[in-house]
């Protein structure tokens, strides 16, 4: 798989710095969050960093699959729902975390589940930007972000796809 013309490879160090920067921004909002709901899988890593930095102990997940072949967004499917107890009060005092908002389709589904929650992503593209309350870096819509969990020295298919190496 070759990198697209506008590739943005992100190292583990850079992602950690950006996730901590997001935590700093969130700390400045004076939010008193009782829990984080992270959108899996991309939200897992920033949620762990943010939970540590802000002292949040409860992390819940919602799983919405959108990238089925690592290149294009497909049909959105909710694979795991949010715990009903966190849906009370429409997500008031809940922090939703993801790595990226791209088209905003995933964000819109989660926002509909928790309209009063605070939505934070590390990166935002213009189409998804209106659905996010806090983010760190905006990238152009035609940029493909390569996250460190997708990369070795080059893009690596997941082991489950049958190729090791």
UniProtKB/Swiss-Prot annotation:
Enumerate the InterPro entries for this protein. PRibTrfase_dom, PRTase-like, Xanthine_Guanine_PRibTrfase
Which Enzyme Commission numbers does its entry carry?
2.4.2.-, 2.4.2.22
The reactions it catalyses are: GMP + diphosphate = guanine + 5-phospho-alpha-D-ribose 1-diphosphate; XMP + diphosphate = xanthine + 5-phospho-alpha-D-ribose 1-diphosphate; IMP + diphosphate = hypoxanthine + 5-phospho-alpha-D-ribose 1-diphosphate
Tell me where it mainly resides: membrane
The record lists its disulfide bonds as none
Supply the Gene3D superfamilies for this chain: 3.40.50.2020
- Which amino acids does the record list as binding 5-phospho-alpha-D-ribose 1-diphosphate? 41-42, 98-106
Q: Name one GO molecular function term.
A: magnesium ion binding
How would you describe this protein's topology in the membrane? Peripheral membrane protein
The protein's required cofactors: Mg(2+)
| Residues reported in the UniProt entry to bind xanthine | 102, 145
Q: Give compartment(s).
A: Cell inner membrane
Task: List positions binding Mg(2+).
Answer: 99
Give the matching Pfam families: Pribosyltran
HAMAP family in UniProt: XGPRT
**Subunit and interaction comment:** Homotetramer.
Q: What is this protein called?
A: Xanthine-guanine phosphoribosyltransferase
What is the scientific name of the source organism?
Chelativorans sp. (strain BNC1)
Taxonomic classification, please?
Bacteria, Pseudomonadati, Pseudomonadota, Alphaproteobacteria, Hyphomicrobiales
Q: Which gene encodes it?
A: gpt
């Amino acid at each position: 798989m070759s990198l697209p013309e506008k590739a943005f490879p992100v190292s583990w160090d850079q992602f950690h710095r950006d996730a901590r920067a997001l935590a700093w921004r969130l700390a400045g909002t004076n939010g008193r969050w009782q829990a984080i709901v992270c959108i899996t899988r991309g939200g897992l890593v920033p949620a762990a960093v943010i939970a540590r930095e802000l002292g949040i102990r409860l992390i819940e997940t919602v799983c919405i699959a959108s990238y089925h072949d690592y290149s294009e967004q497909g049909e959105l499917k909710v694979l795991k729902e949010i715990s009903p107890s966190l849906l009370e009060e429409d997500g008031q005092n809940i922090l939703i975390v993801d790595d990226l908002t791209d088209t905003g389709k995933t964000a819109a589904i989660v926002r509909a589940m928790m309209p009063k929650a605070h939505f934070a992503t590390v990166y935002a593209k213009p189409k998804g930007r209106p659905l996010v309350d806090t983010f760190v870096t905006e990238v152009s819509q035609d940029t493909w972000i390569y996250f460190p969990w997708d990369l070795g020295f080059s893009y690596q298919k997941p082991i489950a796809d049958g190729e090791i190496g």
